[in-house]
Amino acid sequence: MFARVFKAMPARASALTSVNASIPARFMATVRQQRPAHERATFTIRDGPIFHGKSFGARTNISGEAVFTTSLVGYPESLTDPSYRGQILVFTQPLIGNYGVPSAERDEHGLLKYFESPNLQAAGVVVADVAEQYSHWTAVESLGEWCAREGVPAISGVDTRAIVTYLRERGSSLARITVGEEYDADQDEAFTDPEQIHLVRQVSTKAPFHVSAADPQCHVAVIDCGVKENILRSLVSRGAGITVFPFDYPIHKVAHHFDGVFISNGPGDPTHCQETTYHLRRLMETSQVPIFGICLGHQLLALAAGARTIKLKYGNRAHNIPALDLSTGRCHITSQNHGYAVDASTLPSDWKPYFVNLNDSSNEGMIHKSRPIFSTQFHPEAKGGPLDSSYLFDIYIDSVKKYKASQAAFYPQRDSLPSPLLVDLLAKERVGVQPTIGMQNIAAAATAAAAAA
């Protein structure tokens, strides 16, 4: 009897076939992804615990500084943030990759829509569980496929709660991801400390480039220490034309051509950027131009003003950190990614704290008492993350436009907007950025394969 029942099932199967036929092919391709075979992988914290899991990225070993983020979403933006250059990023969210990885599509300004830079910047990825089957209308590949294509090793199936507990108690530590082999204690000397590397030099453009609104109303110079695409978008969408300069460009020598100066985010120890600090100090001595800095830009501005910076025990990396505006008493929920902070007690007398972190009381911003200069440690452009503080870009652009108007009153012939010829000559995106370690590994493997052939 049961045999007769099961033989009667084809009609139901044909109905399912018709349903499948009505589903878009791209979605079905997502659903039908084959579960890949995983190699063994090991995540080792130097002088600390060892965690065994499965590799789902590039088949290569890597070392760097292990840091963690508690952000629930936004892994494509986080992993392409130049501020993570040289770091192994541990995600506390239990499941990562469920909405895949989008394409490198660009918007009307030529800026990447879904990434913060063209390449995956983190040295390695650590997750508790990775979604091998993803679904999102913008997705074109899985997190594992993306990591493999970018040469970045990634490990899943490890106890990220234990890892984060260790990092919170001991502080950010050097670590390594080893794929396809057992951990060897004799390899400890191979641990790479990104804090000893001038990371900003790696991620900064090597030549100026220009991005502009369709009808720019002001012209802003951006100091590129590893600028995120959404910072550029936040400026351009408010009517600014922007020319982006290398981190060590003597901006004080050309500031009179601009209506404002912006200092970007970036990776590593701020004290490595001695050239930037010097040029900013000279800029504040010789010009009244409005200045805005974010993250590393905030720290560099503080150093230029005469303050000091300190390294945090494990940093602040999340989308939900409360920061108090000391001028209004308003609390903002902010997006953050930094391992250093400004020591507010060392601010000169003509500066005052602007924001303070309500979790650890660290400084989150500063403002000049008499000039249009301010900076924030958190990211008001927040992609991903809350937009509570995005109005700071409005405040900055307003000050830029006021400065432009005041300069026009004194210098009627002054035109801060670049000539069309200059705009045509300048590049439209970063120039000469040093490839990530992952991309270097891929290039080396390709060279070796070609030589063997």
From Swiss-Prot:
Record field: transmembrane: none
Entry keyword Endoplasmic reticulum: no
GO cellular component: carbamoyl-phosphate synthase complex; cytoplasm; mitochondrial matrix
InterPro entries named in the record: CarbamoylP_synth_ssu (IPR006274), CarbamoylP_synth_ssu_N (IPR002474), CarbP_synth_ssu_N_sf (IPR036480), Class_I_gatase-like (IPR029062), CPSase_GATase1 (IPR035686), GATASE (IPR017926)
Record EC number: 6.3.5.5
Gene Ontology molecular function terms on file: ATP binding; carbamoyl-phosphate synthase (glutamine-hydrolyzing) activity; glutaminase activity
Location in the cell: Mitochondrion matrix
DNA-binding keyword on record: no
UniProt transit peptide range: 1-28
Active-site residues, as the UniProt record annotates them: 295, 379, 381
Chief location bin: mitochondrion
GO biological process, one term: glutamine metabolic process
Positions of the Glutamine amidotransferase type-1 domain: 219-406
Keyword terms: Amino-acid biosynthesis, Arginine biosynthesis, ATP-binding, Glutamine amidotransferase, Ligase, Mitochondrion, Nucleotide-binding, Transit peptide
Record field: catalytic activity: hydrogencarbonate + L-glutamine + 2 ATP + H2O = carbamoyl phosphate + L-glutamate + 2 ADP + phosphate + 2 H(+)
CDD domains: GATase1_CPSase
Pathway the protein acts in: Amino-acid biosynthesis; L-arginine biosynthesis; carbamoyl phosphate from bicarbonate: step 1/1
NCBIfam families: CPSaseIIsmall, PRK12838.1
Function: Small subunit of the arginine-specific carbamoyl phosphate synthase (CPSase). CPSase catalyzes the formation of carbamoyl phosphate from the ammonia moiety of glutamine, carbonate, and phosphate donated by ATP, the first step of the arginine biosynthetic pathway. The small subunit (glutamine amidotransferase) binds and cleaves glutamine to supply the large subunit with the substrate ammonia.
Protein family membership: Belongs to the CarA family.
Subunit composition and interactions: Heterodimer composed of 2 chains; the small (or glutamine) chain promotes the hydrolysis of glutamine to ammonia, which is used by the large (or ammonia) chain to synthesize carbamoyl phosphate.
Protein name: Carbamoyl phosphate synthase arginine-specific small chain
Organism for this UniProt entry: Aspergillus fumigatus (strain ATCC MYA-4609 / CBS 101355 / FGSC A1100 / Af293)
